[in-house]
């Protein structure tokens, strides 16, 4: 069966949720940026040649990013890449980053079976000694550096190394011993998969493989209730160590553990209870991803970090109280945790990333702290029973789909200083009755309030609104009166389409153009008085407004679009000077 890697999980998450990372080019090299941590990873650069010097920091826009890693296959196949200088800030080099490069193909770059770049062990070959002592002064070992090497029998790691990266010793069939120093703080996924140690049944105890106090893997013999036991205290769990163990129901993590690594309990679908000790300071990405029966996972009061998608689709997870030490909730942390009703957010929280609470269909209440500065796309989308939300003043822009599909949300309190309401921010909030638009607001996004069926009124004046985008208030079926903001010059397509209760619209003095279908099927509208600024009425702008009886057109009008007033049954077709461009069927179905 094909193994599901962390890369696969990330790809799936990014398919569902918007990416929080972005790419940028700096001095002819491509980087992937992490805005949460202001770090950069050297991305795929397949055209690299000659000599390259990676900088320690790059500047993109207003931010300075520290370059910390080289991506998987970053320079793979760059045969003309002869030299590369890596900064001290690099702490990870992913698998195959330099495969097929001129650096790897040049035999002069190899020493005793090892390829080194700036004190980083990149790769090994069959000429390595069977017992290899990694020298002190080695900065790090690249992911997969020993992978598939059949020569090595024993590896002694130095105290200067802090991480064994993913697939480092994978498929090393003759490897029987690795000396892991206490300085090692993390072990990547599949670091020992199918190596000689892994294949030796005598090394396994009760379904777990433990090396020098590090639990590196588990198998099908793992009991339903796992208690950490070893001659040495278990101080470390490898990434994905318990992943997909369907038999696992209960885990008591000992107080010798300080970190729960990435995907540690990924898709343990029958896991119901996890005891996390107070010693744990970091819970990394996807740690409990897809643990659908998990009910209890009490987080330590002094937890410092909660990673991306930690409780993603933990459908039975109950109330959570988050440590005040946490400043960022990363992407998809509680995505589709259907049974969470309440959650206590950190007092110093600054950022809620994309989709953090999306699909939390039982979440009744959430109090956002005043320290909050950023809310990501879909942060509360699909929180079907959430009733109210108050956005703190530090938030200056509402993201896309922030509360989309919050079908019972009836009130949204927006802060002074708000600049924009994002696309579909409140779309499908069927019971939304009250929302204040601050004076500072510049833009209301595409379908921002689409299908808010109980929204009776919304004050667009006095505000700084320059843009109301397509379908912003489409299908707001209870909306009765609208006064357009004074700075608005163009009314976008379908803005008030199918607002079937809309009776009056007060146009401003600067409006020049009304977009396609802007008031389509506003069937309770009876009278229109345009100001002298109006020049263009778009296609189907007022089509199907069946009770529209009177329209006063200004002399400034230049074009009336196709089917602009089609099927306005109560409207008598007006006469226009010949210089006005009138589209086909503009008044079809009106009284003559």
Label each PLM-derived region with a short phrase.
Residues 72-74, 94-97, 143-145, 165-168, ...:
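Consensus positions within tandem repeat domains that build extended binding/scaffold surfaces
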Residues 40-41:
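Non-globular, low-complexity intrinsically disordered regions
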Residues 28-37, 47-69, 79-94, 101-118, ...:
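Structural signature of tandem-repeat unit edges
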Residues 1-5:
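Positively charged n-region of N-terminal signal peptides that target proteins for export
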